[in-house]
Amino acid sequence: MNKMQKKTVLQPDERRTFDQGQVDLVSLGGVTFGRATLQPGWKWSTCVKPLAKTKSCQVSHLQYHLSGRLRAVMDDGSEQEFGPGDVALIPPGHDAWVVGNDPVVLIDISGMANYAQPASHPAGPAHFTD
């Protein structure tokens, strides 16, 4: 049945917390939509790597940045910084960290279904009930 649906990240289907950050997740139409809040000092390699147990982040992200500044470096050494209003595609094989003293708030529409879960969590999209 085709019908409009609405959810809010203010009442997420799931909240994942990790060192210096959290992700609020909602799922609609088979897409997991995440709002990440990353505090100053957050760095993937120190705050999420212990959960993921991979050398670098192996998730592809498509993000819209609302506030704060985030810098990412790919395994090949290329770097980019993102800030408010930026839309970013960050492929697998990267580290990232908050730049400065302001929290980063971003919306991610492609990389959050399995983000910041222990490595023993089964692969594949998260399952939600509407």
Ranges and model annotations:
Residues 1-37, 45, 121-130:
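A short, N-terminal "cap"/entry segment at the start of jelly-roll beta-barrel domains
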Residues 15, 25, 33-37, 62, ...:
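Conserved hydrophobic/aromatic beta-strand scaffold that supports enzyme active sites
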Residues 35, 89-90, 95, 101-119:
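A short hydrophobic beta-strand segment most commonly corresponding to one strand
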Residues 35-57:
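Conserved short histidine dyad/triad with adjacent acidic residue
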Residues 38, 54-72:
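Short, conserved beta-strand element in jelly-roll/cupin
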Residues 43-44, 68-73, 96:
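Short beta-strand segments in beta-sandwich/barrel cores
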Residues 74-94:
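Short acidic-glycine-tyrosine-enriched beta hairpin
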